[in-house]
Amino acid sequence: MERLDALLRGEAPSHILPFLWMKGEDNETIREELVKIEECGIREICLESRPHPDFCGPGWWENLDFILPEARKRGMRVWILDDDKFPTGHANGGFIRNPEKKKVYLAERHMDICGPCRSGAVLVENFLQPDGKLLGILAVPKPDGQTLAVSGDGIMDLTDRYENGFVYFDLPPGPYRLFVLYTTQTGGGREDYMNLLDSDSVRVLIDEVHEKHYARYPEYFGNIIAGFFSDEPELGNVNGYPFDNTLGQKDRKLPWSGQLEAALREKWGDDFLADLPALWYESGEKTPGIRVTYMDEMTGLVRTCFSGQLGSWCEAHGVEYIGHIIEDDNAHTRMACSIGHYFREMEGQHMAGIDVVHHQIVPGFTEPVHQWIAGDRDGEFFHFGLAKLGSSAAHIQANK
């Protein structure tokens, strides 16, 4: 009854916060936009920062110096989209200035060798990317030449046999695959972007965007400034929008960080290097367990390093953290353009966000295949799964 009485008094709570596209317009134009929004009964907006030519520069601050008092006068709250480029993670160019903190990938190159071989040598230096850092070299038995599978047993660690660009070895009879495992910051997806698996990398975004806003407008935090919005942050280990990027795919770089390496070394112990090829290739009975462990540790770092860190910063400064990821066709459980685990990414956010765009939910198209703007996609997921992700997170996560 209290809600009904409030509605009858015209005291409806805010349930919508449209983007106010910031393109560097003059303040009078912005005032006109705010008036129109207010006339629609809307009391919250999200500043769409990315079209602005001077985000976190003098032009941006001039606009916010005008918007925030106007919002206060009109009883409106303001959210801020947290970056200068799509998707969230560019940190307003922060990784151009701090390249050592940008995204890192785990990569492999290999060649096949047939034993027996004594005093063998292979030039492997050129297997690495120009910036590649060698992680290890393995000789892995191949069970046959019919598939890409390798053996999970009998693996030889040749890392300490690497010298001056060559690896030297003796091999017993049989076919072997020589794996060169390395890390690199090039050749993957969005390279000048933050590493969601690295706390220091995510801190660059906070320093470049969040802290700068707080330093200028502390008196508006928690009242007029409601919080920050992240748009489709991604692991970004490969280019584009493959919704099916999982482990077990050849020639794919994988998300990586020093924190992830430390976690996997603790889990796998002496088998750390020997277990890595299973991330790309079938390696016997141990393959599923290795892949589950990698995904578990990796997405756990998404939670703690990325969403948890941003959410904690916002809470400490009296505001909230909201946004969404790419969920299309179950991509929320995968890598590339998404983050591997919807619920872990959402844990740091204060609302359970989803993205419904491009005619994804169309009445009647409830089966696994229907045509939408991106091709033949999963109508069953869009119809019955997508919204349920958000409602489930809202029920099970206490900060929602």
Regions found by a protein language model. Give the residues of each.
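Active-site clefts of carbohydrate-active enzymes
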Residues: S49-P51, T186-G189, A393-K400
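Active-site mouth loops of central-metabolism enzymes
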Residues: I16-E28
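Substrate-binding cleft/loops of secretory-pathway carbohydrate-active enzymes
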Residues: P87-E100, P233-W256, E315, V319-P363
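Conserved, well-ordered alpha-helix/loop/beta-strand core segments that scaffold catalytic motifs
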Residues: E211-Y220, E297-I325
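Mature extracytoplasmic enzyme cores
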Residues: M1-G10, H15, T29-C40, E44, ...
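Catalytic-core region of carbohydrate-active enzymes that cleave or remodel glycosidic bonds
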Residues: V35, Q309-E315, V319-I322, S338-I361, ...
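Conserved short loop/turn motifs at secondary-structure junctions
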Residues: K23, E48-W61, M295-G300, E327-H332
